[in-house]
Amino acid sequence: LGKMFIHSPSKFILDSMALFTQSKSFEANSVLGNSRLNQLGLHRFRVQFAAQMAAQRRSKLAKFIHPADVENFQKNGFIFRENFLAAEEFSQLKQELLTTPLETRETLQGDTVTRRMALDGKTLKHMPVTRQFLHSAKWRNLLNYVASFKVQPISYLQVIFSHVRKAKADPQTNLHSDTFHPSAKAWLFLEDVAADEGPFVYVPGSHLLNPARLNWEQQKSEAITAKTDVMTRRGSFRV
């Protein structure tokens, strides 16, 4: 650490301060990526501390959602609802989403194109059904509970096209952990997704910080080198 400070005092100070933030990149942060510190349990501590703080906040938010949803999340790490909306409301929402012209951006990763259309404040002015749904307490309370605090989510209409070219598989299909701290993502599917069309996959119970999970976090943090895959080096551990 002394050598790191002497080499670049300002970077060392900034990297050290990032320990108390959501920063996760092992390659961009000299402190987070320090192998000796991670052998001593730095990454493991950050994982445990973040989970404890999230659990405390969720305990205060649980009253805003159904007890069955709380139970499912605590057991599985996610909340799954079929027919989340009434048939008529869902039909109106789907019709509005599929017929409203939206600015589109897309990314190409491996053999997969992901196309997203932002549902921001400007767009939602012309989409009353979608706006009502995204702002509803029924939807927001679930997001807040899983995230463990009142969030300002970024919402998109998303379409994924798999196997569009001969290339390596989409790296997002590799089982992975997005980051070291609890986070929230949510999907309302407009169509059923077949097994060969890239359905969302989550390992039930993988959010639990049992000894096996903590040992995995520890081992991954210790093993990161310049040859480790880029997503893991950036803090999104691949399984």
Feature roles, as predicted:
Residues 2-76, 82-173, 215:
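Non-heme Fe(II)-dependent double-stranded beta-helix
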Residues 126, 155, 182, 196-198:
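Residues that flank catalytic or metal-binding motifs in active/ligand-binding sites
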